[in-house]
Amino acid sequence: MTEPGLRQTGEATAPRSWDSATPTPLTGEARPLPGGAGFAGAAFLGQGVWRTELSPGQTLFYRVPVDWGQQLSATAELDPASGDARGYTADALDLTLYNPVRATVEDAGRGYDGTRRAAALAPVPPVDYRNRYTGIPRVKGMRFAGSYFLTVHLSAGVADDFGDGPFGLTLRVRIKGTAQDGPGYAGQSVPGNLFQVGPRERATGGELGTGSGDNAMKALAVSGIGTGTVLLAVLGVWTLTARRRAAVQMRARAQNPTA
């Protein structure tokens, strides 16, 4: 996988400032939207409040188009448990943001005690080519336009105290800002259109993805600051294990996001 160089090189420094205030979670009527079972079948969504169900040990996948200059925020809320069950599961709810090359940008976890609990991503900057020139992972990760991914995982351990579910889940996604012109690539990415938001993606928000726009990309960034950034293609199927700790360990081994 290749990110093309630029027609004209610009300032090789990260943006000095951006709105890093914790955003207010989006409100409004929730619309039903089941998540996909993997990256290839991730459900398309845009800004809004989305509703589904999640069972212990399950991971849901969503694809979120984010263009140049736009800033993404997301919160996942787990409903209270039914009945009078009591207990506590550490690291029960996990919300993770991946960029278009599937490198981890930010991760939020929350324990569960049977009451309504929410995991919110820490603020990330607007998408900017120059974000690659920083050493801060959650800033550096927002250096591409294109399809970002949100995954929501519920630990299998939740079933020990609160049953097999499923549990109600609300996903609140905000996309702030107007799309801007890109950095001016000198050519096409390989595969094509990897680092842009196309008309189809804008129009398909809220529909279950079929994987046709996936570009068969099992990709990880291995270099992020040079002209013509090369991305390593990885064969195989991406999976997440039942428990969040194992999932995090697997992502660290499989993705090795050094871009």
Predicted regions span which residues?
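Extracellular/lumenal ectodomains of secretory-pathway glycoproteins
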Residues: 1-2, 67
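Generic serine detector
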Residues: 17-20, 55, 73, 82, ...
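Hydrophobic single-pass membrane-targeting/anchoring helices
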Residues: 203-259
